[in-house]
Amino acid sequence: MSIPLIKDLEQRMNKSLAALKDELATVRTGRASTSLLDAVMVNAYGSMMPLNQVASMTVPEARMINVQPWDKGQLGAIEKAIRDADLGLNPSNDGQIVRVPLPELTEERRKDLVKLVHKYSEACKIAVRNIRRDGIEGLRKAEKNKEISQDEMHTQEKLVQESTDKFIKLIDEAIVSKEADIMQV
């Protein structure tokens, strides 16, 4: 019972870490990245669609994203969606392609982004700790029902704590890396 429990907890913790990395990918740094536009939804063909399903995106230079729609009729909708996405971007449409220049981040904006990144990391740490709590409760319930011995419960609790510590460390490493990217001028 205990080994599958540990594997299940680690899978759940891994999902939390993956969700954090997805959120971090949408946080703007000084360099252009197509992942910045992943959350943009375009009103295309009568429904809301992710930008990457109606256009291809490239990064021709460090602070520019080019969005090439597959249907030129969607240029206006794509430009409007990027402008309305509240990313602080000002796209321009030249009739063939939507160019999205990334303005230089101010020191104040960088600090705001670092605060946002820390908020994301704290939410992820809370999720990991809740997963740990679920695991320990499961172990205590199993011990109470005489499914495992008290020694086995303590051994497994240590394994759960080690997994938790490992994932908290991975979260911290991801945050330090993202913070360095944001603060780099």
Swiss-Prot record:
Q: GO CC terms on record?
A: cytosol
The answer to keyword Methyltransferase applying to this record is: no
Q: Which molecular-function annotations from GO does this UniProt entry contain?
A: ribosomal large subunit binding
Look up and give the organism this protein is from.
Answer: Magnetococcus marinus (strain ATCC BAA-1437 / JCM 17883 / MC-1)
Q: What does this protein do?
A: Responsible for the release of ribosomes from messenger RNA at the termination of protein biosynthesis. May increase the efficiency of translation by recycling ribosomes from one round of translation to another.
Subcellular location(s) per record = Cytoplasm
- Specify the superkingdom: Bacteria
Which family is annotated?
Answer: Belongs to the RRF family.
Q: What is its main location?
A: cytoplasm
NCBIfam families according to UniProt: frr
Which protein are we looking at? Ribosome-recycling factor
Database matches in InterPro entries: Ribosome_recyc_fac (IPR002661), Ribosome_recyc_fac_dom (IPR023584), RRF_sf (IPR036191)
Query: Mind listing the UniProt keywords for this protein, alphabetically?
Result: Cytoplasm, Protein biosynthesis
Residue runs in coiled coils:
none
GO BP, one annotated term: cytoplasmic translational termination
